[in-house]
Amino acid sequence: MHTTQKDTTYTKIFVGGLPYHTTDSSLRKYFEVFGDIEEAVVITDRQTGKSRGYGFVTMADRAAAERACKDPNPIIDGRKANVNLAYLGAKPRIMQPGFAFGVQQIHPALVQRPYGIPAHYVYPQAYVQQGLVIPHVQQTAAASTSPYIDYTSAAYAQYAAAAAAAYDQYPYAASPATTGYVTAAGYGYAVPQPLTAATPGTAAAAAAAFAQYQPQQLQADRMQ
C-alpha cells in the first residue's frame, strides 16, 4: 500500500531570522496560539548541530497558517523574524521608514548641488558648473605677484645685475706665494646671464681679460 503525502502548500510556514538559541520546542510554543501544529523544526548544521537561523512550522489547517502569517515580522525569542508560506519563499523584513536597503539618506539641501558637494568646492570647468568659486588667474597677474613665474630676460636681468655689482666689491687678492701670477683687477664670480643678453662687446671683453694669462709668462714665474 502506498501512503498518500498530505498537501502542505498552504499550511507549511517558513520562519527566518531566528536567534541561534531558538529550539524546536520554543518555536512550537510561539505558533501554538494560532492553531494546532503538526510539526515545528529548527534547521541545524549537520556537523556542528547549531541552528542555521531558520526553521519550518506546519499548521494543521490553512486558516491557522493564514493567522500565523498575518504578522510578517513577529518577535520570536527576542528577535524580529520573518514569516511567510514556505512555497512563496522568504519575505524580506519590513524596513524602517526613511531607510532604503542600506542606501544612506542625503540631506535635501545637498540634492540640488552636483554630486552632493557644496557648490564652492566644485571646479567650474571640470563639472560644467559655471560661475563658482575657483577663479581663473591671469598670467600677467601671476607674473607680477610671483618672481618664479616669468623667467624672461627682462625679469631676470635685474637680479643678475644686482648680483654682479655686489660681488664686484670684493676683488680677489693674490697671496705672497703667488706674487708672480698676473691677476685681473676687480675679479668677481661669474653670474649667469640670459642668452638674449649676450653681445659681441661682452665676448670681446671676456677674451681680453683671459688674454693676460700668457702660458710663457706663467711658466717663467713658476721657475723662479
From Swiss-Prot:
Stored SMART domains: RRM
Induction, per UniProt: Up-regulated by the myogenic factor myoD during gastrulation.
Pfam families linked: RRM_1 (PF00076)
An annotated GO BP: RNA splicing
InterPro entries: Nucleotide-bd_a/b_plait_sf, RBD_domain_sf, RNA-binding_reg, RRM_dom
UniProt key word Cell membrane: no
Entry's Gene Ontology molecular function annotations: mRNA 3'-UTR AU-rich region binding; mRNA 3'-UTR binding; mRNA CDS binding; pre-mRNA intronic binding; sequence-specific mRNA binding
Localization (cell): Nucleus; Cytoplasm
Gene Ontology cellular component list: cytoplasm; cytosol; nucleus
Superkingdom field: Eukaryota
Domain RRM: 11-88
Domain observations: The RRM domain is necessary for mRNA stability and mRNA translation regulation.
Protein task: Multifunctional RNA-binding protein involved in the regulation of pre-mRNA splicing, mRNA stability and mRNA translation important for cell fate decision and differentiation. Plays a major role in pre-mRNA alternative splicing regulation. Mediates preferentially muscle-specific exon inclusion in numerous mRNAs important for striated cardiac and skeletal muscle cell differentiation. Binds to intronic splicing enhancer (ISE) composed of stretches of GU-rich motifs localized in flanking intron of exon that will be included by alternative splicing.
Name of the protein: RNA-binding protein 24-B
Organism phylogeny: Eukaryota, Metazoa, Chordata, Craniata, Vertebrata
Originating gene: rbm24-b
